[in-house]
Amino acid sequence: MNEPSPNALSRRSLLIGTATGAALAAGGLHAAEPAAPCCAATVKTYRSADFYDADGTFLVDKAREAYYDMFRRFQYPISDKLQKEMWILDFGLNDFAHVGMAGIFWLNRQDYKYFGHEIYLLPGQMIPEHCHLATDKGAPKMESWQPRRGMIYTFGEGEPTPDLIGKIPASQREIVKSRCCTPLGIDEVGDLNRLTAWHFMVAGPEGALVTEYGTFHDMDGLRFSNPQAKL
């Protein structure tokens, strides 16, 4: 069997959220969108119910449009590549307005052990708490985060920050182990405090676009503290 490309995603579920965007771009229904003109756009708020049908099926297209609306508000270009390759996850938790994300892997080089990723979070949205373990393919992932639009609350191991615990969505607040919070504004950089540490982030009230720098990311080393969370 052929080895996957070093840039390939290693979970089929990450590809599902890209399918409609790729189909639209391939069909010529979307050209690359330039940054929107400057305006005082209103921040939209969402309920998790907005992203599921009556049977509880996650509505990826509605989630995608919510991110696109945020991109336009932030004057962030919606390129052809982004339309084709952005993936969207609710982590199987059925609480997408509060726990979920979108993203794109710009590169993931096992051969040279480096990784580039953009993280997209709606207002108040959280990535589930997780850690990265060593695998047969590489060492535990190390990472740093730099907000480009909006701001984030990064949570990691260490002395708890009681006045910011309320930023954690209620559905995850009693599950997480990481209670030391460091807010990051535009172009501030935060780091994972040690290899294999538990960590997560929560977007501020406007949402967030975050550049992540890291070492090679093998999905087989990803672990969630919430036993219900999955890719």
Language model features: what each stretch is:
Residues 2-21:
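N-terminal secretory signal peptides and thylakoid transit peptides that target proteins
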